[in-house]
Amino acid sequence: MNFPHFALLALTTISVSLSASAADVAHWPLDTYKAERWSLPHGQVESVPGAKGGGLKLDGASVIELQESAPLANESFTVSLWFNPYDLSGGQQILAGKNRYSRGERQWSLTIEPDGKLKAHLWQKGWVTIPCPHSLNPGAWHWTVLSVSKDRATLYLNGQAVGETPLKSPISHTDSPITLGGIWDAGHVRQAFTGAVDDCLIHPFARSPEEIAKGYEPSAVAHDLPKPTPPVPLWDASQILPAAEALPQVEGATFHVLKARRPDNDGCRWTLGVGLEWHKGKLYASYGFNTGEENTPSEEAHVRVSEDGGKTWGKPLVMDAGEGDLGVSHGVFLSHKGSLWAFMGAFHGHFKGTTHTRAYRLDEQTQRWSPLGTVLTDGFWPMQQPQKMADGNWIMAGLHVSSGPENGSNPPTVAISKGDDLTKWEQVIIPTAPNLGTNIWGESTVIVQGKRILNISRYGTKPLALLSVSEDFGRTWSPASASNMPMTTSKPYAGTLSTGQKYLVCTNTSNTGGARSPLTIAVSKPGASLFSKVFRIRSSEFRGTPGVSAPKVDFSYPYAVEHDGMLYVGYTHKSHAANELAIIPVKSLLIAP
């Protein structure tokens, strides 16, 4: 009998000791559980037949936290885990790990990679990895072991060593607990695993190859795989979606620095969410700015202005720095009837439960921003410039940040204005398909086609675009469902070009999973409903930019606006705290009808 439970499971150990004796092994059988062994509900787990007795099934939105595990698995150790993968196309999935990225705590991870193979990751002031050459079998139990000494790490699959790497220094200790099925970080499940886990052990020393080989006994238990729900079409299935290295480079694009990378002279530690708008011959850009950590009260909304089409930028101006525990962050612009409006995401204190949207209008004489107060509450964060609909109202795409328990999903949403009154909006939260689970972070964008509105949104940690459709000017929506278009785990930005082509800026390739590189733009044929070609805007290492060029670059939260035959695309290098601009000739995106 199956027993579904909501959980960030905190499972107590059978035996935990901090001495280096062989008898002092931390063991989590994961056969069953009792209510008093839980804490911090998140996601859903279910009892299933395990490799050894019972096991726990995770739904792709759950994570298991091992109680009292923070002191374990440092320097010399061995971690072993039975796992049964259900979906090998879900991007990078954590089987086990000891990391909290937002706190700078990184030690090690065991993952299933986008290619469906096992890999170990070890922190050495940067990740070093041990890839496994063997494919995994969905529905079957596998046993993985990571054996680590002070100067070497070895990865095993089903009792056999599959790779190793030298370590320049021992794996350092952090306060992060060990988690299974994902990483629990800043209130979110990251790199979630879909499948089942069983029998996790942590030895306080590096086990020998002979011990590990002797400890493996194959499991004949197999699981029936969940029947996949047919994806909704967003990509033209008659066309092959290329791998990143096979994408055509968009022609004629130029690149400019909007905000220089860290360390800059402004003390910035974090920036995100470029917004763009042309207004009276000038190009305005906004972004979130923080000398501290993301989503904290020290967040500010900054603005810069270019008078030469984005080639150079004036000094940054503070639109709103907030007061007390108020943080004001990134948002969107709208130039309307001679006025420049801004709608910015904001929050009090700890972000969740207080998210709202504030409106501002530019005073043309003083070049200062006049605050107009809160115009949307209940968790609305703006993600796309408002667009006028044929019924006379404006529609603004966004994210609904849940104010309930932390296991609540954060679905895509839109706001609809009261005609031309841009201070009065109604939020319409988009329902989500039941099979998506709760691990959703629905940063969304819309394409307006008369009364028909398409909403494309980020899934969460799964690298796949969600799609929802309204046939009544955004008043009601089909449930947001998984589409047939891979997309990285970042905010997308979409629209319709003057050529009649739909476009989508994000990272859309067949092989990059949740990586935010390269930066791409997908387009349709003129008047067509499906995307059918993807261009590369730029790659991580790129000689054509005056800005960041590095082996690992994360192109985050793009934004786009068309003007005089050019598409202006803003984006953030989140890990480098830099904002940049690509200017693309619209004619270079044209494909034959």
Regions found by a protein language model. Name each.
Residues 7-17:
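Bacterial N-terminal signal peptides
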Residues 23-227:
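Extracellular glycan-associated modules
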Residues 217, 221-269, 278-326, 335-489, ...:
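Beta-rich carbohydrate-recognition and catalytic domains
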Residues 1-6:
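Positively charged n-region of N-terminal signal peptides that target proteins for export
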Residues 18-22:
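Sec/Tat signal peptide C-region and signal peptidase I cleavage site
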